[in-house]
Amino acid sequence: MTQAPVTVTVTGAAGQIGYALLFRIASGQLIGPDTPVRLRLLEIPQAVKAAEGTAMELDDCAFPLLQGIEVTDDARTAFDGTNVALLVGARPRTKGMERGDLLEANGGIFKPQGEAINAGAADDVRVLVVGNPANTNALIAQAHAPDVPAERFTAMTRLDHNRALTQLAQKLGVSVNDIKKLTIWGNHSATQYPDLFHAEVNGKVAAEQVDQAWLADTFIPTVAKRGAAIIEARGASSAASAANAAIDHIHTWVNGTPEGDWTSAAVVSDGSYGVPEGLISSFPVVARDGRYEIVQGLEIDEFSRQRIDASVNELSEERDAVRKLGLL
């Protein structure tokens, strides 16, 4: 175990996702079983005590890879020298809240965090935004970190990807391991588009193994509205599954995608597939040499085009709204 430790910052660390995430990071699941980790837990002042309680529990696990924990309410301290930043803490939408108010409230969180990452994060920093609206929160943070390469800012659609894998596997009576090349396009919202036209199940096109009515009327809405269904059933939003997807996203980013497969992540668009340059949108991606790259050359049929465009239009509207608020 001669590897240098990786510093991982988790915001909203005292929340449910943070609680589900931190023990898995400390056990070595984020990067790998040979990489020591140092944890930084960032919280708002009134939640610092709760985060300190979580830190006590982490200590009590005696994880061999865990080389230290720091709890703070100061963003500059939290992101100083950090290699991986998991931005989980966000302002949730409350009843009757307009989208503009939600974007403004989150701007107040993600602008200073972007500035703090810009000021002090390690040169190899990787940022994953989990807190919703994740794509646009990532855009705000990235806009305020001009010295960090834009490609280092990502938002999480791996939870949607994993949800889609399981829905398809259950429909066809196969293992999730039998499914390759599934894609989530667009926004992490109800407009997202889970694409089966390029996905393969045991080497055959997935969309050809299900009927069109199931795909359009059951599969797509089930994946898109799964978060709401979990709130309805559990009385609280997805926490362990979101934490699991965050682990998957970073682990893949660092260690690579399997040969002959890809995954989904919201990354800064380079104009591929008609997505305006600079938007943070979900694409099919491969991870190579520690970088996410958009899979090129896929043919997009009319069914898919309409759905991708609808989600991308929503992202453009969100970007315009935060621009008007002076957050970009």
From Swiss-Prot:
BP GO terms, sorted: malate metabolic process; tricarboxylic acid cycle
Keyword Oxidoreductase part of the UniProt annotation: yes
Enzyme class of the recorded protein, top EC level: oxidoreductase
Keywords attached to this entry: NAD, Oxidoreductase, Tricarboxylic acid cycle
Superkingdom of this protein's organism: Bacteria
Function, as annotated: Catalyzes the reversible oxidation of malate to oxaloacetate.
Name this polypeptide is given: Malate dehydrogenase
Organism of derivation: Saccharopolyspora erythraea (strain ATCC 11635 / DSM 40517 / JCM 4748 / NBRC 13426 / NCIMB 8594 / NRRL 2338)
Taxon lineage: Bacteria, Bacillati, Actinomycetota, Actinomycetes, Pseudonocardiales
